[in-house]
Swiss-Prot record:
GO terms for molecular function: ATP binding; pantetheine-phosphate adenylyltransferase activity. Its cofactor is Mg(2+). InterPro entries: Cyt_trans-like, PPAT, Rossmann-like_a/b/a_fold. The gene is coaD. It catalyses: (R)-4'-phosphopantetheine + ATP + H(+) = 3'-dephospho-CoA + diphosphate. GO terms for cellular component: cytoplasm. GO terms for biological process: coenzyme A biosynthetic process. Reversibly transfers an adenylyl group from ATP to 4'-phosphopantetheine, yielding dephospho-CoA (dPCoA) and pyrophosphate. ATP binds at residues 9-10, 17, 90-92, 100, 125-131. This is Phosphopantetheine adenylyltransferase.
């Protein structure tokens, strides 16, 4: 069985992430969506909220061969512990590629048996970023349906706007 891990902060999960997960399923038998924690990053949602929301969204989409997990540490270590040979990374633009390629080089030095698969974003999701969702969320009456599923919007709205 070909298994891949798709790591990210998912702060929050977007249609861009979901598109990459769907496309990964065309390549792999199983995809583990890994809600990762980067200690140098400041998050909008707590670790538990990011994990719970990502898990709820994946569940609502009825993906039978997608699991959601969480991890704090090097993704390559998670892959090794779980006998996963592939890491999927999404690429929106050239600057994403620069960052992801550097991660690939580090991972390759740590364990050359784990491959990184770079998937470019679909044209309709090139502009979708969790950062934009967070900024737009602070505005009232903004339609975020092109950025996030309704479940995400409602959860964020109840947390940040309805208070």
């Amino acid at each position: 069985m070909r298994v891949a891990v798709f790591p990210g902060s998912f702060d929050p999960i977007t249609w861009g992430h979901i598109d990459l997960i769907k496309r990964s399923l065309a390549i792999f038998d199983k995809v583990i969506v890994l809600v990762a924690k980067n200690k140098s990053k400041k998050y909008f949602l707590s670790d538990i909220e990011r994990f719970s929301l990502t898990k709820d969204v994946i569940s609502s989409l009825n993906f039978s061969n997608v699991l959601v997990d969480r991890y704090s540490g090097f993704i390559v270590d998670y892959a090794l512990i779980n006998s996963i040979k592939f890491i999927v990374r999404g690429i929106r633009a050239f600057n994403d590629f620069d960052i992801e390629f550097e991660r690939y080089l580090v991972n390759n030095k740590l364990n050359f048996e784990i491959d990184t698969i770079f998937l470019p974003s679909s044209a309709e999701h090139l502009y979708v970023r969790s950062d934009f969702v967070k900024e737009l969320m602070l505005k009232k009456d903004v339609d975020l349906s092109n950025f996030v599923p309704e479940l995400v919007f409602n959860r964020l709205k109840s947390k940040f706007i309805d208070k």
